[in-house]
Swiss-Prot record:
Membership in a protein family: Belongs to the GcvH family.
Subunit description: The glycine cleavage system is composed of four proteins: P, T, L and H.
Keyword Ribosomal protein belongs to the record: no
UniProt modified residues of type N6-lipoyllysine: K65
Keywords noted in UniProt: Lipoyl
Job description of the protein: The glycine cleavage system catalyzes the degradation of glycine. The H protein shuttles the methylamine group of glycine from the P protein to the T protein.
Lipoyl-binding domain span: 24-106
Cofactor (UniProt): (R)-lipoate
Designated name of the protein: Glycine cleavage system H protein
Protein encoded by which gene: gcvH
Length: 129
């Protein structure tokens, strides 16, 4: 069974977000998603300064099995990207909720966070797959 930290919020498309002290949110893909994809070989990230819209694809995770679009769980401006993934995409596999984060967003509408799933709700999504 996948690890689903309770302090995070989740999108049904397998992204997670974590609120940071500056009000931004860190975005990554769940352990379940990286298990399905397999070994990461390349990650394409948005650019700092890009505006992302909740539900729109904004990054790509490419593994030995497939390339998968990564969707923005919330709308806002990209304020940071995880440049370590450029040389070490395997961080997504080894530490999906830590060093394998994708990007940070300063939200334009924080109420979108309320529409995301808690750990229990995300587990239910996995169980239905």
């Amino acid at each position: 069974m996948s690890n689903i930290p309770t302090e995070l919020k989740y999108a049904s498309s397998h992204e997670w977000i974590r609120k940071e002290e500056d009000g931004s949110y860190t975005v990554g893909i769940t352990e379940h998603a990286q298990e399905l994809l397999g070994d990461m070989v390349f990650v394409e990230l948005p650019e700092v300064g890009d505006t992302v819209t909740a539900g729109d694809d904004c990054a790509v995770a490419e593994s030995v099995k497939a390339a998968s679009d990564i969707y923005a769980p919330i709308s806002g401006e990209v304020i940071a990207v995880n440049e370590a993934l450029e040389d070490s995409p395997e961080l997504v596999n080894s530490d999906a909720y830590g060093e394998g984060w994708f990007f940070r967003v300063m939200p334009s509408d924080e109420s979108e966070v309320d529409a995301l799933l808690d750990a229990e709700g995300y587990q239910a999504v996995i169980d239905e797959e």
